[in-house]
Amino acid sequence: MKSTCSILALLAALAWPAPLFAAVPVSSAALLQPFVDKHELAGAVAVVVDKDKVRSIEAVGFADIAGRKAMKADSMFWIASQTKPMTATAVMMLVDEGKVALDDAVEKHLPEFRGQMVVAEKDDAHTLLRKPTHPITIREVLDHMSGMPFMSALELPTHDIVPLAALVRSYAITPLVSEPGTRYLYSSAGINIAGRVIEVVSGMSYEEFMQQRLFSPLGMKDTTFWPNEKQAKRVAKSYRPDATKTNLAEFQITQLAYPLSDRTRRFPIPAGGLFSTAQDTARFCQMLLNGGQWNGRRYVSEASFKELTKRQTPASVKDSYGLCFAVGPDWFGHGGAQATSMEVRPAKGLATIWMVQHAGFPGEGGNAQGVFKTWALERFGK
């Protein structure tokens, strides 16, 4: 997860650039390798799928530069905020079952939110609170229009060391930054609230619901909040520009507690706690390409699928966002804090999955994703 500004920049980068290639190469690897050679990209796994099959899967560069460990198709990544669309999909399963409605007030399911206030005035000397015009709703926490802040003080600097129920109680006593429904404010807190609603409404823990209702049926065998010992060895190292801005420096993600397999001190975060592979994420995207169903099983109704992937934010707001999906004219998708992304183009019948572990890039490394997506569209989108 990351700051509002950086996540908006990441979502904006999901748009496809103009065609680059006179003759479309058969493989994307040759186009991506120069970024690796120039130390602008550590490594990546790039996947293209249609409704039924994988059209391309390629790995380039390194999962561990110092250890000379090559990136592989089954390398694992912290997908961070790409967890959000999966959480929203789970909420819509419960909507389909009539257990919750998008326009329910959050306080209907989480009574601790009764009496939540909004900031009316604030300066260095005082803060004035008042009652909001209406309680925040499930829809508003999913489309970032609730007025909730990005996170609470309990999540700094590490996001995953507080149980979900306790974390959400901290949000309930946190004043709203703006009136519900009036301002787009990217809020991981809001998505964590939705995850807690899943628990209360379903009678299952959030992670159990996700595993039983989404990950296991889709065959997402490497999607987890707790990579086991073997999986942890497959998690790619994280990189950012070094002090000179011309090379890559390895770093450890501070938002996560370690070891990653610790189920006693690490807790699942609905807004950004998942680890996954490109291939697992591709399964999720194929379900979306098929309008909420895959391999003979329906996960969400057609109506719920449309709610997830249509613009929910009002025309008065510049940010085009659905229920945990960034929404463009002919695409929807989401990115993650470490520059991962998934993008679905229903009219083309294609989805692209881009897996890296980067907090920024030296040189032109940030363009590698666009090069891959342009290649994918020109190679398979006709």
Stretches found by the model and what they are:
Residues 290, 294, 309-313, 317-318, ...:
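Short, gly/Ser/Thr-rich active-site loops of penicillin-recognizing serine hydrolases
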Residues 9-10, 20:
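Cleavable N-terminal signal peptides
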Residues 29-32, 46, 52, 78-106, ...:
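Active-site SXXK
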Residues 117-330:
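Short, surface-exposed loop or secondary-structure junction motifs
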Residues 25-77, 99-101, 115-122, 169, ...:
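Short, conserved catalytic-motif segment at the N-terminal edge
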Residues 61, 312-346, 356:
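Short, Gly/Ser/Thr-enriched beta-strand-loop segments that form substrate-interacting elements
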Residues 56, 342, 349-362:
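Short, well-ordered beta-strand elements
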